[in-house]
Structures are given as structure tokens and as C-alpha cells.
Amino acid sequence: MTDRDFPVSSIEDPLRVLGKHFRSGDQSVFLKAVTFGPFPAGAFPDEGMAQLERIRNELGANAIRMYEIPTLEFLHECARIGLRVFITLPWSQHVDFLRGGGELAEADELLIETIERFRGHPALAGYFVANEIETTLVRWMGRRKVREQLERLIEVGRANDPDALFSYANYPSTEYLIPGNQDFLSFNIYLEQREDFAAYLNRLQNLAGNKPLLVSEFGVDARTHGELTQAEMLEWQVEETCLSGAAGTTIFSWTDLWQRGGQTIEDYDFGFMRRDGTPRPSLDVVRECWEPLSRTSDVVELAGGPKLSVIVCTYKGSATLVECLDSLTTLDYPDYEVLVVNDGSDDRVSEIVATYDSIREIKIDHVGLSAARNVGAKEAKGEVFVYTDDDCIAEADWLTWIAKQFLEDPELGCAGGPNIPPAPESEMQARIIAAPGGPSHVLISDTRAEHLPGCNMAVRREVFEEVGGFNPIFWAAGDDVDFCWRVLEAGYELGFHAAAFIWHHRRFTPRAYLKQQIGYGKAEAMLLPLHSKRFRGLGGAVWSGHVYTPQAPGGGFVYHGHFGYEPFQLIYPDSGSGLGGVVLHVLWWVCVVIAVVGGFFHWSGWLVAGLMLYTTFRVARKRAKRAPVEREYDGFAARWTLAGLIVAQGFLRSGVRLLRGWKYAKWSRGLEVVTTAAWKKVASGWWKLGYEKAFWSENGIGRDELLAGISAAYPEAQVDASGRTDLILKRCLLWNWALVTATEYHADNNRLTRTRLLARPRFLIRMIVLPVLLGVLVVAPFTPLLFTDAWKILLGVVSGYAALTAATRIFMKLRRPAILRIAEGLGMDPVE
């Protein structure tokens, strides 16, 4: 039998991802997984295959997670029993794997060999390309570089098996390390307070975006808490995982018998099975929790749930209406109605609605979206109005998650969830889906929103009436923004749940997309006089919360904490405005045109225009690179087309907004935004002069002991409050030395500690020197207009700057702190 002649399997369809769920065939799958191994040598001579029947039947699991590469026979047995297998790639990720490249080559080879062995196997669920890369090591290597390598590993895997699923098993200390191309978000979470666990799951759901969330590890030590408490905690863990809408959970572990790095672990008892093979009470408890679960919404209690009125307003939307109404007639909610407001009394819409006995049609003259929504509310019978669009498709449990929010908080004004675009059917559609400006929620916390798009927004009847419904001046867009702001001003909150998602088609052509963005620009101009305090100068709306987009993590600030040990290292995303927004604004293009015209009088104008254009397309290219394009349609052409859409979107939307709303724009505030963004860029800049050294210890001495020794030797040293580095050593009036360290843990008590000294100019110097340099760069093109020997002046400035930089480097190397002497005093040996 070849490795492709797989035996008969009780698993009929492979595991796939669709939205925030796992699917097998046309059925949603809630993953009920348990970790399996690695076992001490000789614990299970048959790889533990005799345990698989117990895992499937006694525990009720449908998947296992492994940390070693199994044999093909092992996967055959899993397929026969009905257990899917997640394989964690075991490679040397505990060291600086970016330095030599050997570890990455090892990982590539192992991944390709493993995929070649198991490609197409019915039991294969997916691969974890790495697991919990240590936080200070990630900081040392650089989070962007590490993320790029994880993404590269995933691409290597996909190139060899396009149908397999890939992810990185993350943990809270590197929360920011999220590969943009992974198929689902995975997190190992060990939070032992129910409220903390539930709150963190909500956060992870928002980080997951349009992808499923899998709890890739959760466990409770029975030795610490007792066996009954372990069972109780695992019970609420399963419940909270489901209530968050996560796609599955993995419990650590099947048995107390396990090892790490060749060492048998005997200090913890996480297993369902004791070391002697007898079960703990947690086995029966978890089985009873898992048994009735086929999807996450099964745990939601709907007793006393409100009557819901689903309102669809359509204006000549027959092209997508059938798909929308088909989904609305099969919703799994006990008490709801569906109303279609036919704005404009389109005959084709009436014909479609007439084929559904349970749907009411309301014909009206063409009055616009806001007025149509008000008509729907007037005719509705429900306690809650649930709005969606004619190009949306609802999941069966959509209303369950909407109702859950109102049941949990009787004072909630509105509720909603994400809107996710269906898979693209063409290259251009894939690019438009990745383009900016689509309808998106704005969150001020993980469960509270500042804005909910009208395609997925529910509102209580009494709140709707109190704020006066939708403002009829908005005919096509902007109505939901105005409505949400008025609800907030009335003192109500907007709820949000990541599982309450709907599918929402984006525009199908570039022309339709750009027309939509023009409409959004018009709507923003209409919002300006109504909510002037919520807009910044010449730009768009100012949000207190974060606008969620499917863009891969890129910018933003990470708080690493004291010596990089913060247990929950959050990423604080940038606003997406600042200088990046400036170079895409229509006024930037006005300046480009002025510079081009000036070029006809002197060549320096064309130079300025060229630099401005380069800056614009550099920003657009960077944003296009971070945008998630469906991999089937990704490539060079896709990224450059997307960059063009980004430039066009910024120009058209800001142009229409300014053209329609210039009377209400606060020009002084716009100038303030630009200058503030430029000032922050200068103030946060680092001049790095890296000086690296590594130290070896066979006595368990690592970075903690070294940092303590350095702190003692330099009493004036300060802990870096941001955690970007460990210590800031103030050695010079004009400069600071910053120290960052990381320790690699090798076999036995061996440690390799890496140190990096970074020279950083003091704040005053940065505020003086950098603006001067920027000024020189700006003025340089115009020197021919001012001086006859301009080239001599420019050459002198450049030469002086180069000489100053070289002298500074030599001086600072001579003045660097004596780390070597301190390390040797601790018994650490320098490594060349």
C-alpha cells in the first residue's frame, strides 16, 4: 500500500475554513480536541494508538493535537476511529533562528517531508508551523521579521499542499505575532479565572477578524487545584469557549505522562488520565459538555428572547436578493419576521419576494435608504429591529447571537457583529475586497462599539423611537454613522459580538467600488455640519475606538513590559491617519500639480513633485502589501492594482468630502493634524548603533542575572518603561545607551545570552538635529534659485554630515558600557 492508498475512513470530508467556522462538507464543525504527547520513552510502545479509542469514545473528542511527527499508520488509525489530527512542527525555535538560517532550513525540510507523507490524508486537520516562540526572543529578533518567517513557512507549506490548513500556535505574551496568511487564529491560553478567560476570548475573536478562533491549549493542574476543581474549571472553559463563538478548543492534556526536551515532566498533573492510566472526574464532565455540541450557539439560552423583525431595504437589488432571502428564511431563531422594503417598487423585486410565503413586502416610492428603513420600522411588529442589506447572506445562528446580547444587557441600545465578504469569484473582486473603505465596525472595547454598519445592526424599538429613527437626508450612505452617534449621545451603548456575523458582498467592479467611495465622501460631507466635533480638520471622522479592517498587523506599538516579561503584550494599532493619510489626500495632489507647474520654470519643481509622488506610492504600496488578498488571486499584479485602488480611493473620497463640505472643514485643525503627525515621527525616531555580544553559561546564568549585575554596576541606569529595551544607561550628555537582551535555553543548564547595545540621541538632540536635517532636504532642491554655487553648498552639507556621523560612531564605540567585564564577573564566557 503506497502512502496515497489511504484505508477506509470514518471522516468523510476534509476540514475547511469558512468565515469564523470550521466546516466539513456543508456542516459546521466545532473542534473538541485534546493534546496527545509527547510521551516519555517507553510510555506507549505503540505510539499510544491503543489510547485513541478511549479519546474518541470515553472523552468524545473529534480531534487531537500532536507535538511530534506521527507515523502514517498512526494517522490511518485516527482516520478509522474518526479523530482529526493537528500536527505541530517540532523545530529549533528556541534560539535566534534568523541569525544563521540553519534552523529555518531545518524547519523547511521537516515541513516538506511531513507534508509529502500526509498530503491528502483524511485524518489530517492541519499544521501548526511553530508553537509559542519565547517573547524576549521575538523582541530580540524583531516581531516583523519573525512574523515574516512564520508567513514564509506557511507559504512553503501551501506550495506543497494547497488544501491543508496552517496556523501558528500563539500565546498572550506575543499576542502581536499574528501571521497574516494563516487560515485560523490559534492561542494557547492558561487563565484560571472564568471572567478573565471569557474577556480574553472576546479580544482574540476581534484579533481573528474574519477567521476562526481555535483555543490551541487550555489546561488545569489537578495537583494544584484538586481533581474536582479541575473538572469544574474545564467545564466552564468549554462553555465560555462556545459563548465567545470560537471554532473549537484544545484541552491539555490526555494523560499526565508527557515530556519536554527529553525530560519527563512530573511536577504537574494536567491529564484526563492519571499516570497509572485511571481516569479523573474531568473525563466524564468534559464528555457531557461536548456531547450535545455541534456548533457554538448550542450553548446559548434563548428563553425569554425578544421578537425580532429583520428589515431588508432594497433599491433595484434583485441581483443578490434571492440569496439573501433564502438565508433569512432558514434562520435558527424561534420568533422573528422578515420584511422587505421595496424602495422604488421595483417589479423584479416584487416577483422575487412573492415566492416566499413568510416574507412581507412593503412597496414605496423611491425615498432613499434612511427613509426606507424608517418605513420598515413603522411596519415591524418586533421588539427589536434587525437591519441588513439585500447583498447580505445570514448564517443560521445570526439572530441567536444578536438576541444573546440584548438578553445579557437589557439596557443595550443596539447590537451587531462583523460583516464578512464571501470568497471572491474573480481576480478583480479579490482586489476590491482587500481595498480600504468597506463597511466596518468601530470598537471601543471588545464587546462595545462606537459604530455598527447598517448591514448588520439591531436596535430596540424604544431606542429607535427615542432618537427619532434614521435621518432621511441620507439617501445611500452615512445613515448608520449618524444613527449610531445619536444613540450614543442619548446615553445608550452599542453591543458587539464577533459570532453575530453575516456575509456581505463587496462591490464587483472597480467602477462600482469607486462610485461607492464617492458616495461615502458625500455622506461624510453631510455628516460634517451635524457632528462637527467628530471630524478632524480636512480628514475623515475621528473615532475614539479602533476601525477594524482585515488588514494584516503591521504598524502600531507593542508594550513589552518590564524586561520584556509582560504576560499580555498588547499591540496598540496606529490610527491609520497621520502622514499616511496626508499623502493620499486630495490636497496633497493639488500640491503635486503646483510643483509640476513650477517645474516648467525651474527643474527643482519637478524634483519636488517626483519626491511627493514617490512618497504617495510608497505608502500605497506598503498598505497594499499588508492587505489580505485571497491567495488564489494573489501576486504582483494584484498588489499593484490594489495600490492603485488605494490611491484612487483616497483621492476621490477626500476630494468629494472637501468639495461638498469645505464650508464646515476646520482648516486649522487639519494643519494641526499634519504637524502633530510629523512631530511624533521625529520625536519617536531612533538612531541605532548596534553592538552585539553573546555569552555562554553552563551554570544556568542568563539575562536576569546579567541585567541585575549591570543595574548594580550602573546605579543611574533606568528600566525602559516601554519594554522596547531592558535598560537605558545614561552615559553621555547628548546620548543614551539602551540595552536589549535575550537568553536561549539549551540542554541541561546551558544558556546562551545575547546582548545588543543601541545608541540613542537624547530627546533634545532629536528635536534639534532631525528637524534641521529635514529642513535641509526640503530646501535643497531650491538652492539653485538662491545661490549661484549651490552644488558646493550641498556637497559641503553632505560631507559635513557624513564626517559628523563617522566621528560620532567612533566616539560612542569608545564610550560604550563595559558589559563584557560584568558578564565575565558572573562566570559567563564571551562567544565569538
Model-derived features with residue positions:
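Conserved donor NDP-sugar-binding/catalytic core segment of glycosyltransferases
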Residues: 397-429, 493, 505
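Short, acidic, metal-binding catalytic loop of nucleotide-sugar glycosyltransferases
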Residues: 326-335
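Short, flexible, basic/aromatic active-site loop/helix in glycosyltransferases
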Residues: 417-418, 432-450, 465
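Short aromatic/hydrophobic "clamp" motif used to bind/position activated sugar donors
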Residues: 385
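Aromatic-rich peripheral "rim/lid" segments of glycoside hydrolase catalytic domains that contact
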Residues: 252-303
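Active-site mouth of glycoside hydrolases
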Residues: 16-17, 23-182
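A conserved acidic beta->alpha catalytic loop
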Residues: 327, 342-350, 392
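Extracellular glycoside hydrolase catalytic/binding regions
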Residues: 139, 144-244, 271-273
